[in-house]
Amino acid sequence: MRVTFYTLGCKVNQNETGALAQLFEENGYTVVSNEEGADVYIVNSCTVTNFGDQKSRKWLRRAKRENPGAVTVLTGCYPQAFPDEAAEIAEADVVTGSGNRHAILTDVQKVLNGEEERVVDIRPHEKGERFEELPMDKFAEHTRAFVKVEDGCNRRCAYCVIPRARGPVRSRDEASVLEELCRLADAGYKEVVLTAISLPSYGTDSGTSLVELIEKAAEVPGIERIRLGSLDPDMLHDDDIRRMAAVKKLCPQFHLSLQSGCDKTLRAMRRPYTTAQYADIAAKLRAAFGADNVSFTTDVIVGFPGETEDDFEASMAFVTGMRFLKVHVFPYSRREGTAAYDFADQLPEHEKETRSRRMTAAVEEVRAAEAAAMQGRKASVLLETPLSATMFTGYTKQYLPVLVSAPGHKTGDIVEVTLGAWDGKRCRAEIV
């Protein structure tokens, strides 16, 4: 039996798809690419935006059109957040949510064996439920491993449907995380990324903390780099920063979730910080890790309900002033079930798209300038994608993309380089 996966959304989704692929392989399935014909098509959905829902439906229709006899599966955040809507999608033979992922295998088998014509198995998340273990030790990149350590979110930001899609905070057992890190190190992975739905919430439900986990992860032999997923700035405290700076394996690249650079919009979004507080946290991280050593990335929403042209200009001024190395810009997507869905002053789609283009152009200028400022500096690069026998792409600790000629080296090696010119996509570099 052949199975293929189509994944939308965040690194957590990608991690879960990898774990599901491993589960199916261990039960006799062959995982194939989307271009190949399969007996089972699985869509791991994202519902952050309406566009994500549309893409999930489109891919299911395509799968049924190309292979009418195949079993199609819709799983993840979309059915969890909107179960009635997802259950009505005729092209999906199996519909499951963001929990109880192990049951997908059984549900698929029921349809394949003719025991059930269709299975809808969306279970609501409950307070007190435990983190669902989905072990994974094989990654497509073969160099960087993503390790899921937490699920769920207890916040209620006005624009966000994720708490509805993912349920409450559930932390993975620390021993389980460390065991997986040991397996990954034994398999040759040198860099791990700790991922989660709400990473700073790790341990808040189990009496530990993210910083403790980072410190213990750094003790795993063979793991040379630890990178963090998205962080909420208000959940980083002075002692956390001090302890993190003492962990030499921790990459000094921080994805600090911003969403808007306008205080009025942040209040409307129900984000629990101001731009001044955000800038203060960033300044403390720069001081702790070294201003020339640290980098920041973030997410920004434009076109939120009530955002005026002045608000947008204020947001753009703050965002460009922060000198982010990379910014993911999103036009606001109106999601049913969120507070902002009912807000007045919804902006027209064309205005949101225009602001998205303007913000993107501005942050790309900053990205190029920040990369150019690094020219001549020394950096360590993890070699990831071979373009030829000697040419590789990879990333510095600061997550700067690099192109380097490295004869005698292989994927997964960490090499010391001197950074050169920025070509619009990456820095060219030379081995020291």
Q: For each of these PLM feature ranges, what is it?
A:
Residues 186, 211-212, 216-220, 225, ...:
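Radical SAM/AdoMet-radical enzyme domain recognition
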Residues 256, 299, 319, 327, ...:
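Hydrophobic, well-ordered secondary-structure elements that form the walls
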Residues 307, 322-324:
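Contiguous mid-protein beta-loop-alpha structural module that forms a pocket-lining wall or clamp
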Residues 1-202, 239, 244, 250, ...:
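Proteins enriched for Cys/Gly/acidic motifs involved in redox and nucleic-acid/cofactor modification
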Residues 47-52, 189-216, 220, 232-239, ...:
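Conserved glycine-rich "GG(E/T)P / GGGxP" loop and the immediately following alpha-helix
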